[in-house]
Amino acid sequence: MLTIEQLNTLIDAGEIDTVIVAFTDMQGRLVGKRISARLFRDEVGQHGAECCNYLLAVDAEMNTVDGYRVSSWEKGYGDMAMIPDLDTLRLVPLDCGHRPGHRRSEVAR
């Protein structure tokens, strides 16, 4: 777990430069956006971000699926709000410790 205060401290120290705002789609994948950490701190963390509701109306290959009331080619694919749940903040392990210009360690397979 990561508190908003801890996140802000890491942002100010330059330890975090990107925040992923995401939700699970109908296949259980995380979808959303990567946002500048400072933009997240100053705006998105309080007010949310927008994304297309298309993300909730596609199959595993990202093809649109008929039958959804909120979105379709006939009704259109509108924007929806992603409101962060700040009680679910986490560090993403694969992104931890990477610095631009520095070599990334190998991942065991």
Write out the residue ranges for each language-model feature.
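ATP/Mg2+-dependent ligation/transfer catalytic cores
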Residues: 1-109
